[in-house]
UniProtKB/Swiss-Prot annotation:
Pfam families: Ribosomal_L13 (PF00572). Part of the 50S ribosomal subunit. The lineage of its organism: Bacteria, Pseudomonadati, Pseudomonadota, Alphaproteobacteria, Rickettsiales. This protein is one of the early assembly proteins of the 50S ribosomal subunit, although it is not seen to bind rRNA by itself. It is important during the early stages of 50S assembly. The gene is rplM. InterPro entries: Ribosomal_uL13, Ribosomal_uL13_bac-type, Ribosomal_uL13_CS, Ribosomal_uL13_sf. Belongs to the universal ribosomal protein uL13 family. Keywords: Ribonucleoprotein, Ribosomal protein. This is Large ribosomal subunit protein uL13.
C-alpha cells in the first residue's frame, strides 16, 4: 500500500465556529493549531494547506489558569521596536481588558503553528472576534463544542 499524499484540488475545507467563553487558552490554542494545519484529518499532508477555517467568538472571555491573568505579574508578552533599549512588555491581563482582547488567542495559536510561509497561510484561515458576533454566516460554519470534550477544557 502506498502512502497517500493529497493534491491541492482534493482538499476540502470546512468552516468551524468555536465559542471561547470560559475556555482555557492553552487547550483551545493547541486544538485550533492542529485544526488549522489539518492534522485532525486522515488526508493530512505536511506540505499543503489542508486545514479548516476556524472562527473563534467571545475571545474576551477566555480563561487563563494560575497567575497568568494577573495584570501585575502575570504572563508577559515582549516586543522589540528595533531601537536600542526598545523592548516593550505587556501582560495577558492588560491585553484581555484592553482594546483588542482577540490578540491573546491569535498570539497563542501563532506560536504553535510552523514559522514559515505555509504557517502564515494557515494563520490566515483563523478569524477571532472579541464578542459573539461574526460576519461569516454565509459560509454556514459548524459549531465545534470544545468545552464538552474534556472537563479540563472549561474553567
Amino acid at each position: 500500500m502506498k502512502t497517500y499524499s493529497a493534491k491541492p484540488s482534493e482538499i476540502e475545507k470546512k468552516w468551524w465556529v468555536i465559542d471561547a467563553k470560559n475556555i482555557v487558552l492553552g487547550r483551545l490554542a493547541s486544538r485550533v493549531a492542529n485544526m488549522l494545519r489539518g492534522k485532525h484529518k486522515p488526508s493530512f499532508t505536511p506540505h499543503l494547506d489542508c486545514g479548516d477555517n476556524i472562527i473563534i467568538i467571545n475571545a474576551e472571555h477566555v480563561n487563563l489558569t494560575g497567575k497568568k491573568a494577573n495584570p501585575k505579574d502575570g504572563k508577559i508578552y515582549y516586543r522589540y521596536t528595533g531601537f536600542p533599549g526598545g523592548i516593550k512588555d505587556t501582560t495577558a491581563g492588560k491585553i484581555l481588558s484592553g482594546k483588542h482582547p482577540e490578540r491573546v488567542i491569535k498570539m497563542a495559536v501563532k506560536r504553535m503553528i510552523t514559522r514559515n510561509a505555509l504557517g502564515a497561510k494557515q494563520m490566515s484561515n483563523l478569524y477571532v472576534y472579541a464578542n459573539g458576533d461574526h460576519p461569516h454566516m454565509a459560509q454556514q460554519p459548524t459549531v465545534y463544542d470544545f468545552a464538552s470534550q474534556n472537563p479540563k477544557n472549561k474553567k
